[in-house]
Each structure stands twice: as C-alpha cells, then as structure tokens.
Amino acid sequence: MTTSTLQKAIDLVTKATEEDKAKNYEEALRLYQHAVEYFLHAIKYEAHSDKAKESIRAKCMQYLDRAEKLKDYLRNKEKHGKKPVKENQSEGKGSDSDSEGDNPEKKKLQEQLMGAVVMEKPNIRWNDVAGLEGAKEALKEAVILPIKFPHLFTGKRTPWRGILLFGPPGTGKSYLAKAVATEANNSTFFSVSSSDLMSKWLGESEKLVKNLFELARQHKPSIIFIDEVDSLCGSRNENESEAARRIKTEFLVQMQGVGNNNDGTLVLGATNIPWVLDSAIRRRFEKRIYIPLPEEAARAQMFRLHLGSTPHNLTDANIHELARKTEGYSGADISIIVRDSLMQPVRKVQSATHFKKVCGPSRTNPSVMIDDLLTPCSPGDPGAIEMTWMDVPGDKLLEPVVCMSDMLRSLATTRPTVNADDLLKVKKFSEDFGQES
C-alpha cells in the first residue's frame, strides 16, 4: 500500500457512517471492518509520531466497538426482532444466551471449512508408496491401529496427536497423506492449506482455525492434514503482521491448549523447510519424521510403479541401471523422467516419414490379431511406406513400445530439482530435532 492508506481508511469510514445512518447495517459492518484493516496498516507503516499513532488507535477502537455492536445486532435480528441499535447503546445480554449451535456466524465458518473435508478417498494404498517404511509404520501406529484396536490405547498409552513429515520437495510427503486418507476408512480427513484459513477480514482467520479444530472434534476420529505448514506457522518475529501472529497463537492453543481435548484427532503437517517453523509449533508435533530422497531400491520400485501397464521392453537389469543413474533424484523427478519417456513413442510417431504394416491386436477387440496396423520405421526398412502420421487412419496406428533408449534420452534432459544446500539444511534439522523414517 502507498501513503494514501490513511486517506483510504477515512474514505471507508465516511461511507460506513453513511450506510450506518441509512440503516444498511450489513454494508456498514463490512466497511467498518475494512476501514480498521487500513487504519492498522497506517499505524504500522505510515504514522511516525507516537501522538499520530495514539490518535489513529483511538479511532480504531471506536470503529471496532461500533462494528461489534452491529455484528451482535445482525446476529440476533431474526431471532429477537431487535430494533435498530443506537451508536452509544450496547445490545444487552441477548447474545450471551445463544447456544453455540444457533450461532449463524459459526455455522457459516464451519460450512466454509467443510469444503476441506476429503469426501472421496484418493485410492492410494500403502503399497503404492515406494520405500518410506518407517514413516508408514509411524502413521499406521498413529492412525490405523487406534481405530481398529481402541482397547490398545487406554490409560497412559495414547496415540500420537501431532506428526510432522519433513524433507526435500518431491519425496512423497503429500502422497503419504493421500495414502493415510485412503487407508483410514472410518476417519474424517480434513485437507487444508493456508488459503482455506486466511481471510482479509480482521479476526476471521483465527476463528476459522478454531472452527476447524471444533469440526474435527465433532467428527472424530479425524485427521487434519496441513500441507506446507510453514506458510501458516513460521517463526514469530517483530516484522510479521498482527493477523499472522494471532493465527499462530490460535494454532498453539487448539493443538495443545488448556481446555481442549484432542483425543481421536491427529494433526498431520508437511513441509520442505522445517527450520522456519516456530519452536512452539515444532514442539506440538510430537513425531517429526524425516522423509529423505529415495534409496536405490525405492527408486527401482518407483520406475516400475510409474511405468505401470504401459507397453515397454525394459528388463529388471535396465530398471536397476536406471535406479543407479538417478542418485540424488526425488520421487517427483523420477515421475517426470518416466512421463517424458512415455511421450517418446508419441514423438517418434510425429516425426516419422515412413511407416510399415505390422501385425498387432485390434483396437476394438484386443483378443483379435490383425495384420494391417501401421508403425513408424526407418526409410530403409523393408516394406516402408512414405507417409506421415496425418495419413494414418485413427484405428490403424500401433505405437512403438517404450525402450531403454527412450528412458536414457529423458534422463539426459531431466536434472534433479533438489538443491544440495537445502538438503544439508534438512539433514541438519533432522539431526537436531527429527527422526529417521
């Protein structure tokens, strides 16, 4: 924002006052709240003298007080048929007697958060996750066992309530969370990001955090998965905004605060930069599991998983050679290599100048073999017909299978995305605070 922030706040308050006098209370409330945000920004970045700051702060309190009265009035309008609220008169104690379930604001926030509930299971099983056996066992211990054998977790033996998955990008942290959502059949799975919990309205973000945890407690057993948790819970410092500080405080209170019973609720966080997490947040993640770059055996399994049922002629020796050549690559990097190699046959079809007739399965009925399919070939090949892919009928193309040379070509053009410096930082964090997976 520029130096016109204070003027913008004054303009908004002027409009809010006009709407207030015209008894358009909903619009007035919105404008008051918006104006307060601009005033707060002006206090922080534009007002240089203490006297100016104090003057703006006093005005802020006045408009906030009016906004609260309007909010209470609107909340109780339908139920109690209240008369328009006077500027210097409070609403009385009608709102105190409201039950939580009848609170329309709370209901609206909870409906907004219900969009974070994963209703359809992702269909990713533990077997689909290559390697990471330690992380899988820890998640089974925290999620699956308490649901299946609740009698095991009584007395002092309680399941973990906070698990942090950290490691370089592309190592499978979010993929593991999808596997948890699939395998935890009876759990409600909330998948939230910073955008689900951030609001431009003053005070609404922390209410969203509080309501998220209340929803999770209502639907337990439940799992709250927060991807890129560092964007919400970074270290507290004097340069951060007041809103960010309040969100962090609410997270701390809800995860392990007085009066909050989180039995049956697991908070699962994932981050690539764990060293920026606030120390109090880090403590609340009782298990901190390092998700490293995949080892050779896991990389070989990844190549097999990503190739799937696509036609190829790679042998086990080829797969192990590829695994050896991809030291330092993440699971996401390997996925990109395989996807690119699967496109190589398509590129051969596009660039081919000659095709030849071959025998292969029919497109309409794979059990029937036909001998008039066309596949790309070199110009010197016996039976080569000069034509381009545009001349090939749609149901007569037999694409080449993926071969080792396709894989090596894709590998040569794909570099690992994990930076050596970041890897050292993650390993240092793991040595200080983590646990090997």
Curated annotation (Swiss-Prot):
Xref: CDD domains: MIT_VPS4, RecA-like_VPS4
Biological processes per GO annotation: autophagosome maturation; autophagy; endosomal vesicle fusion; endosome organization; intracellular cholesterol transport; late endosomal microautophagy; late endosome to lysosome transport via multivesicular body sorting pathway; membrane fission
Phosphoserine: residues bearing it: S95, S97
Coiled coil (residue ranges): 15-37
Record-linked Pfam families: AAA, AAA_lid_3, MIT, Vps4_C
Binding-site residues, ATP: G167, P168, P169, G170, T171, G172, K173, S174
Expression sites by tissue: Highly expressed in testis and moderately in heart and brain. Not detected in spleen, lung, liver, skeletal muscle or kidney.
SUPFAM superfamilies, A to Z: MIT domain, P-loop containing nucleoside triphosphate hydrolases
Membrane topology of the entry: Peripheral membrane protein
Boundaries of every MIT domain copy: 2-80
Main localization of the protein described in the UniProt heading: membrane
Sequence segments annotated as region (Disordered): 75-106
EC numbers, comma separated: 3.6.4.6
Record PANTHER family: AAA DOMAIN-CONTAINING, VACUOLAR PROTEIN SORTING-ASSOCIATED PROTEIN 4A
Record note on quaternary structure: Proposed to be monomeric or homodimeric in nucleotide-free form and to oligomerize upon binding to ATP to form two stacked hexameric or heptameric rings with a central pore through which ESCRT-III substrates are translocated in an ATP-dependent manner. Interacts with CHMP1A, CHMP1B, CHMP2A, CHMP2B, CHMP3, CHMP4A, CHMP4B, CHMP4C and CHMP6. Interacts with VPS4B; the interaction suggests a heteromeric assembly with VPS4B. Interacts with SPAST. Interacts with IST1. Interacts with ZFYVE19/ANCHR; leading to retain it at midbody.
Recorded domain comment: The MIT domain serves as an adapter for ESCRT-III proteins. It forms an asymmetric three-helix bundle that binds amphipathic MIM (MIT interacting motif) helices along the groove between MIT helices 2 and 3 present in a subset of ESCRT-III proteins thus establishing the canonical MIM-MIT interaction. In an extended conformation along the groove between helices 1 and 3, also binds to a type-2 MIT interacting motif (MIM2).
Protein name, per record: Vacuolar protein sorting-associated protein 4A
Species annotation: Mus musculus (Mouse)
